[in-house]
Amino acid sequence: MLGARTGGARIEVSRCIAASLKCQTACEAGMARLKAQGVAADDDAVRLLRQCAELCELNVRALQKESRLSRRTASLCFELGSQVARAAWLEAQDPDSHALARDALHLARACRPLVFAA
């Protein structure tokens, strides 16, 4: 057993994978909403969502492969998920933004046990 599974239970890995997939979908939907509103692709909000979606995808692959780097990707998801949740909540103007904030916070909480596992 490598990476996150060394110190984390299988259920924690499964939760982190599920939360990563859900957050990836939410971030991609958020990017589409911003694009539809005319926000430029190089805008900070769009870049943050793109980074989060890409990192979520990488995290899922690392955890599924039991990669040595999976603890690092989970750590980055914890960190970036917290940033996305905060940004989405502070700038929330609609239910979709609140849902994005919820999904990103769920990602951070789901990945946290893998980051701080012994």
Each PLM stretch: what is its role?
Residues M1-A118:
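Amphipathic alpha-helical hairpins
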